[in-house]
């Protein structure tokens, strides 16, 4: 009896289990295809035209028709697009994806190569996996619109005084700064971004938003920028998802020293730090739907990219060692993220 006959005789439900067994492959390809829908500007084109023929899309975006038809047909079969005699349009499910572009840009555009390298990087001495730092920054800024920016504004409201000069160390594509400056017209801001691609996108974004007279962008890492001779006296500094990179790459003493330098240079500074509480091994926390959908892959990728996530209590110890006093701490709005895993800290010199 050959293998196929054996399968037929022993398990008449093989097809059912096959469908279930390869469902992750379907979701893998679907996630990548949705990412490309955003990244190629096809999503924006379909929003603009409502219904677009392949010819229109190819002419506007310089694409090859047969390849584009393949992508459109695939997404139609997955319920993301609809097809009529006039062309393709976004379905209700497709339109509903719009707010989530940042998650696709960061996790797929930024870290797809990381996930594909995991096997080889498991080997002793193999080093760290690579990532697309530009996409990581752009995606993170897109996500921040929903979580980190409202969290930061809430913490700002509880600080003494008002924010007039904001320094963002690790500003990504500048979206964070642009949103703050549009919402708070009294603010002057400066952002530092180590990734060349992210820096260039930030400069372009600030110019397009008409904020060049209020926002300055530097191509620099957070530590290097703080050590430089910049002429800016902030009353608030924001470090969003930056310290765990320093912690992973340079160790705890480097993080403590960096924070000490901040309060030494700016004794009256209001310091806002946003990090993710490491609850990767907490079975109760990880049963949450968003914990599985987002934080589970988020925790995983950090194990392979020389970034060290630690627990809330560890951050509080680090802040105390650096001479900082906790004014307050908050998590994200339950309407956006009820896991309590993303934490914002408002700190001042002790």
UniProtKB/Swiss-Prot annotation:
SUPFAM superfamilies in UniProt: S-adenosyl-L-methionine-dependent methyltransferases
Keywords assigned by UniProt, alphabetized: Antibiotic biosynthesis, Methyltransferase, S-adenosyl-L-methionine, Transferase
Q: Does the keyword Ribosomal protein apply?
A: no
Per the record, the pathway is: Antibiotic biosynthesis
Q: Which gene holds the coding sequence for this protein?
A: mrsA
* pH behavior: Optimum pH is 9.
According to the record, what happens upon gene knockout? Disruption mutant cannot produce MeArg.
Q: How does activity depend on temperature?
A: Optimum temperature is 45 degrees Celsius.
Top-level lineage group = Bacteria
Asked whether the UniProt record includes Kinase among its keywords, one would answer no
Q: Which InterPro entries match?
A: MrsA, SAM-dependent_MTases_sf
Q: Which family does it belong to?
A: Belongs to the 2-ketoarginine methyltransferase family.
Q: What is its EC number?
A: 2.1.1.243
Q: Which GO terms describe its molecular function?
A: S-adenosylmethionine-dependent methyltransferase activity
Q: Which reaction does it catalyse?
A: 5-guanidino-2-oxopentanoate + S-adenosyl-L-methionine = (3R)-5-guanidino-3-methyl-2-oxopentanoate + S-adenosyl-L-homocysteine + H(+)
Protein name (Swiss-Prot/TrEMBL): 2-ketoarginine methyltransferase
What's the top EC group for this one?
A: transferase
Q: Name one GO biological process term.
A: methylation
Q: What does this protein do?
A: S-adenosyl-L-methionine-dependent methyltransferase involved in the formation of the rare amino acid 3-methylarginine (MeArg), which is used as a potent antibiotic against the closely related soybean pathogen P.syringae pv. glycinea. Transfers the methyl group from S-adenosyl-L-methionine into 5-guanidino-2-oxopentanoate acid to yield 5-guanidino-3-methyl-2-oxopentanoate, a precursor of MeArg.
């Amino acid at each position: 009896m050959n293998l196929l006959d054996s399968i037929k005789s022993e398990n008449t439900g093989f097809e059912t289990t096959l469908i279930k067994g390869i469902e992750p492959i379907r979701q893998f390809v679907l996630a990548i295809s949705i990412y490309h829908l955003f990244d190629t500007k096809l999503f924006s084109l379909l929003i603009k035209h409502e219904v677009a023929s392949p010819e229109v899309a190819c002419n506007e975006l310089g694409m090859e028709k047969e390849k584009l038809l393949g992508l459109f047909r695939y997404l139609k079969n997955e319920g993301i697009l609809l097809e009529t005699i006039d062309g393709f349009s976004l379905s209700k499910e497709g339109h509903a994806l719009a707010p989530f572009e940042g998650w696709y840009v960061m996790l797929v555009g930024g870290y797809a190569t990381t996930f594909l390298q995991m096997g080889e990087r498991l080997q002793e001495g193999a080093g760290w996996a690579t990532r697309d730092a530009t996409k990581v920054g752009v995606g993170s800024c897109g996500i921040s619109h929903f979580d980190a920016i409202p969290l930061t504004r809430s913490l700002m409201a509880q600080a003494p005084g008002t924010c007039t000069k904001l320094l963002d160390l690790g500003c990504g594509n500048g979206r964070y700064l642009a949103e703050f400056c549009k919402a708070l017209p009294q603010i002057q801001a400066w952002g530092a971004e180590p990734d060349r691609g992210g820096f260039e996108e930030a400069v372009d974004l600030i110019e397009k938003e008409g904020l060049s007279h209020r926002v300055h962008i530097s191509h620099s890492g957070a530590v290097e920028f703080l050590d430089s001779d910049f002429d800016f006296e902030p009353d608030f500094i924001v470090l969003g998802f930056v310290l765990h990179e320093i912690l992973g790459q340079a160790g705890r003493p480097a993080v403590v020293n960096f924070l000490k330098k901040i309060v030494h240079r700016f004794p009256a500074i209001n310091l806002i730090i946003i990090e993710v509480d490491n609850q990767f091994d907490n079975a109760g926390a990880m049963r949450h739907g968003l914990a599985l959908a987002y934080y589970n892959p988020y925790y995983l990728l950090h194990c392979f990219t020389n970034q060290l996530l630690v627990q809330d209590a560890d951050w509080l110890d680090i802040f105390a060692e650096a001479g900082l006093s906790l004014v307050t701490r908050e998590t994200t709005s339950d309407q956006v993220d009820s896991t309590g895993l993303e934490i914002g800290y408002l700190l001042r010199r002790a």
